[in-house]
Amino acid sequence: MRTHLYLFLASLIVLCAQIENGVADEAATKKLVEQVVTTAGGEEKLLKLFRFRERVLITDTPAAPVAVDTKENRTSVVQVSGNWWVGNNKRDKDKVRVLCWAWSLRILLDPKSKITEIAETTIADKPAFGLRVSEAIKEPIDLWFDNESKRLIAIDYTDTRHLFSEWKKTTAGHEYPSHVAGYRFANRADGTLNKKQWYQTDILELTPLAELPAELRPSK
């Protein structure tokens, strides 16, 4: 009987320690989320609905940004975590909508998101810490932040690492990276990438919107 009591008490102590560690981990993760959102200007400065003009290139050779319209340019309207229109055509690719949701950081504030801290790594020669988001989406997505600046530096999603740079700010104070380069993983498990990019996007203009343009609103 005494042995059973000792085993019960030992199990209880282990369980309490696990709960305490879990609470501590959750608090540390919450603090990191607060830091990166604060760095971005707070929740009110996270993009939610916007129009942007971009150049998208499927190329393994990095190209310099352009300021003029070319045939590769397109204009889109995005509802973060919602719909995405290219021109007046709704885009049905779920993965790009999830990627944009993460890029906006609003995915970190969704109550359905389970967020866990992941081991630090080096990205673009900079130490980076990571936050993994799951449950709110079908496949987990990893957001990486510069250790020093606390800015978003990369997103790992499915088979690609998307690297962000060339930060800009809207007239209303929303900050965003205007250059994105995508590298497919050679080995996702150990984080190694192919040597050459497979696409790049350059945002030429971005405007936050207060409401959907009339031509995109559902007909009554």
Language model regions located:
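Flexible, processing/modification-adjacent segments and terminal tails
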Residues: 25-31, 38, 45, 80-142, ...
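Positively charged n-region of N-terminal signal peptides that target proteins for export
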Residues: 1-5
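Flexible, membrane-facing loop/turn or short amphipathic-helix motifs
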Residues: 60-66, 89, 190-192
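Bacterial N-terminal signal peptides
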Residues: 6-17
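N-terminal, post-signal-peptide region of Sec/Tat-exported proteins
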Residues: 45-83
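Gly/Pro-enriched, hydrophobic low-complexity segments
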Residues: 127-219
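N-terminal leader/targeting segments and the immediate start of mature chains
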Residues: 15, 19-55
